[in-house]
Every structure is written in C-alpha cells, then in structure tokens.
Amino acid sequence: MSKLDLGPAGVALTVSDTYLGQAAELERLGYSALWLPGGQIDDLDRLTEIIRATTAVPVASAIISLDVYPASSVADLYARLEAGAPGRLVTGLGGPQRPHPLLALNGYLDQLDRAEPPVPAQRRLLAALGLRKLELARDRCAGAIMLLVTPAYTSAARQILGGDSTLVIDQMLVLDADATRARETARRPLRFLSGLPGYRASFARMRFTDRDIDGLSDALVDQLVPWGDAGTIATRIGEYRRAGADHIVLHVLNDGGQPGPMEVARELAGGLLAGSPSAAP
C-alpha cells in the first residue's frame, strides 16, 4: 500500500461561527491538511462544509467514533464527497469503547470494504496507541493517528507500522512560556483522558508511574504537551518528526487568554511548512 501523503503539518479546527473562514485561511497559509476533532463532529457534514470552504487541501476526521456513527453513514459521506471533491476526504476512525474492540473494529472496516463505492484502506487512518491497534492500522488502514505520546513512543510505533504506513501525531500544545499557566491549561483535557483505560495504559507503557498519572505530574505534562514560545514548540515538534512522524496536527490548547489555534498557526507556519509544496509563496 502506498503511503498517504498528508504533507508536514495540519491544524485541528474548532467549530464556530468563523471556522470555515479559518479553514480557508489555513489553506492559504500552506497547511497541508485540516482536521476536525471527534468532539467537534456533531454532524458528518461538518467535513463536507470544510471541503466546500477550501479548494484542494485534504480534510480529515480525528476521529469519527465507531460508537457514534455507523459504517453506512461514513460510506455515504465518502461516496458523496468522492463524487464532488475526489481525493480530499480522509476518514480518521477510532474506538469503540466497548468489549472486544478489535473485533468491532474489524467488522466496521469490513463494512467499509464492502460499501459501494468502498472506502479504501488508503483513505482510512486509525486512532491507535497499543500494539494490536497499531498492527490493525498498518494492515487495514493507511496508518495511525496517535495522541499524547512521547517521541520515544513515536519511534516505537514507527517500528511497528513499518515504512509504508502514515504516522500522524495529534499534538496538543500550549503557546505560553509561563510554566504554571501552560501546565494548568494542558492538565484540563488530561484530567479526563487520564481516566480512560486506554490512555492510562498508554501512559504506563511510556513508563509514567501511577503517581505521575494520578497527579498529572509536571514530568508527564511536559513530555506529552509541548509548551513555551514558538521556537520551543517548533523544536519539540521536530523531535517527533525525527522519531518517525510523517504529519503533525497542531491541536492548540488555551485558557481564553493564551493564543488560540489561528494565532498559533500563523506564528508557526513559516518554520513548520518551509519547503512544503503546499506552502503559499
């Protein structure tokens, strides 16, 4: 299977009154993919709206939950968009939060394979943290999306995926050099995610202790969520690329006073997109 080329960096959008205009600006800035987080996908046609608001950039879900949308709905979305905007939709899939998740995932992928037209493996990515989901991402999708991992764990995932699969890092970050403030912003989503069995197990595999996980220690926060000025964040992103990531999603966290996604995207664009064919002249 040929690798899915998403370019160097994309941005996670937040649905708002202005998000379609933001999508168009991000494409003009040269970002090579646009991402809609699962919590923002209250309707699959949000992805359609982003594609219509832009001209050529790939638009990806991160992720469509198997617990929320049946395979038939994803297949219908793909068929509609492939007819009108071929090659632009990337289906990032995740879950399910139920017993025997691998069995459910394989069944869901089987349905996408049998759809008319099928949603091809080359246009599917799978949220994966553990060994078996990474293997499934390698064998039945174009690759994996990973959230809240270290560069060392990224390197280990690359070894499992091999060289022909795409590895996307959904990178939470905070553009703020104040350590106390930045860490508190980072801890807000971590308080919820650290309570989910899959993330807790993933943190343990990265050798974080129960005390680190329960208390969301500075060490855990600092290793999983880059924060600081633009140069510091760009350096941290470079570590993930050197570890084997193909594409970085800027998933910007802020407390309302810190820079938001568009401010961060504008500030980081020059360094992250240098040399990218999609970069604006």
Enumerate the predicted regions with their spans.
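Active-site-adjacent structural elements that line small-molecule/cofactor binding pockets in enzymes
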Residues: M1-P281
